[in-house]
Amino acid sequence: MLKTFSCVAALLTASVFALAQPAAFDPAAKVFRLDGGNVSYVFGVNPRGELQQLYWGGELGSTDAFSQAVPMPAWASFDASYTNTPQEYAGWGAGLFVEPALKATFADGNRDLVLHYESHTATADGFDVVLKDIERKIYATLHYAIDPESGILARSATIENREPQPVTIEQAAAAAWALPSGHYTLNYLTGRWAGEWTLTQEPLHPGARVIESRRGSTGHQANPWFAIQAGAPDEDHGEVWFGALAWSGSWRITVERDQLDAVRITGGFNPFDFGYVLHPGERLETPVFYGGYSAHGLGGASRLLDHFELAHILPRRIGTGESAAPKPRPVIFNSWEATEFNVNEAGQMALADKAAALGVDRFVMDDGWFGQRKDDHAGLGDWTVNPQKFPHGLKPLIDKVHALRMDFGLWVEPEMVNPDSDLYRKHPDWVLNFPGRPRSEQRNQLVLNLARPDVRAYVLGFLDKLLTENDIAFLKWDYNRNWSEPGWDQLPPAEQKKVYVEFTRNLYAILAELERRHPKVEIESCSGGGGRVDLGILKYADEVWPSDNTDPFDRLTQQDGFSYAYTPQVMMAWVTDSPHWLNLRATSLTYRMLSSMQGSLGIGANIAKWNEEEMATAKRLIAAYHQVQPTIVQGDLYRLISPLNGSEFSATQTVNRDRSQSVVFLFIHSTQEGRLFPRLKLKGLDPAAEYTLTSIEGKAMEGTPAAASGAWWMNHGLDMDMNFRGDFKAAAFRLDRK
């Protein structure tokens, strides 16, 4: 039986859709259908000419079809049919009271905008559908594509002005989505610096929930991802609709439950302080808004998104074909906690010796190597090697690192400048500012206006020179403040708000050009931790820095939240010193290692002070990690026990795609009343296959079989040794199919 998504269209028995192709159009009913990955998405043109959503959910049958869309009726005289009808891309006009997709002001002051279907073209994996205002020559081309494996849709819009006068776009969503009336739980991610990735779950009440960043970048406080589950939250069961916006500037997602209990979701550029002037013939391209559906709970949704990101979002470097997943990340050492700004040739070489002894793959020198960079008060913008610290340049250090069989990475912060720098003294007009107004500093730095062509050329130029002159494999690209005074006085006053779009476009353009010129160089997106993580930056960045907070217990909850939206492949997780600088919490090296081994592993501790036992422990666990890393970062992730809500325990499991290997991590936060770790029933294994159990760290209960069927491990489960108790304890096991 079809779900109520199709309540405004009658079901027909005659099929006009050929399901061998991902996209089909019924010209008689004016209905579009997209199929992929056990998902169907259907929309059509109603008799008024509006583009109306009809269905989004599990895949429909090959003989199922829809009649022409029927608009929703009005509700008394206060809510017209126009506002009640779930439009694919509604203009703000004709009495629309829900969130519009597009809002504009014309040269004569008119602000009414009603978009009707004009035409469409089929593409390889979807449609381009053209809408036009009922009178004015403003066009919105909606781009639809569906992934045949996951059923995840990619939607965006191109706004074009064919009027004889300029039009100001005041709001432009990438897409609008709709769900029928029902009881739902909204899931989204919130946080702050050093406290990112908090999974927030709440009933979807009447009204609007706005999730946004006004900061000029993605932000720590919210992330452009959502998941809406029918009914109560459930990891393994129930329908989930989810989405992620690919934009690294100011953004907004609005989730509304309207007066008739229907749900609308819009997302795109943040309309706060937004105004993009389109001159005749000009276009505005929105970001891409990805949306997906799972019938298998939040776990099923996140696994779909993980594999979609690996297959279609992350960069393809040399040696990795489009059909192959990106390679697992190198295990890195980063110098920051060991030396902070006090870097020099001899000290970094000594750290490189220690890192190589651990089995590290990549040595990364952090802040302090350039200009007059003794602390965070000076030097940003002057990207030349400090001759006092590195009298022979970077080459001797890089050669040393290569001789130790590691590659070399370097920290940069290209979009920032210190007022105490040669660059700022020469070009004070290059920063975001309003002339004559104070310039607000954060961390003693200002933001370069990357929207300016001269700033874009400078940033690309110095990075290209740095990478051309040095054998650098990796850049840790940082961004340590948000915007203030977002002026751009090169443009007329009415057009200066274009800075919100052009800054981010130029960031992407620089990254794309660097990839073209230096295709082997990999990038990490860092912004004081997780302040710039989204599917836009991940088109160019191979990994991200989730948080400056590396406390291993805090990271369990952060990594849990992160995993709902992003693959563990990109989640860098460092082992740092104990007690931790933020919480003063003391934990064992084993606990810290296992916490970080759930993602892409890094060492950020001051290893110059490690004793032989610590070196041996880290070396052993790094070697064990290398053996199972592809399963951990590219497999199916199952969150077996959540670390949230005061849980004493937590556990995760990953299973590789052919179900030949699985890795399990178990953590005790704080044992209470002598309770033992609960029996852990595993998931995702082949029930008919036999799996051997091998300890990476810790012991199973005496009598646990050395090998058993997948059915045993999933139905009976794994019991831990009676002595697995205490505070901040960790264990890990691998299972290998015989």
Task: List each language-model region with its residue ranges.
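Carbohydrate-binding surface patches
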Residues: N38, F226, P643-P687
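C-terminal beta-sandwich/jelly-roll accessory domains of carbohydrate-active enzymes
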Residues: S670-K738
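Active-site neighborhood of glycoside hydrolase catalytic domains
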Residues: P391-G393, R425-H427, V431-T590, S600, ...
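Conserved, mostly hydrophobic/aromatic
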Residues: N38, A157, G281, F363, ...
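Polysaccharide-binding surfaces and accessory modules of carbohydrate-active proteins
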Residues: P22-L34, Y41, L51-E256, F272-F274, ...
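Short Pro-Gly-centered flexible turn/kink motifs
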Residues: A104, D112-Y117, Y276-A295, F728-L735
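Aromatic-lined carbohydrate-binding/catalytic grooves of carbohydrate-active enzymes
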Residues: A324-G461, F474
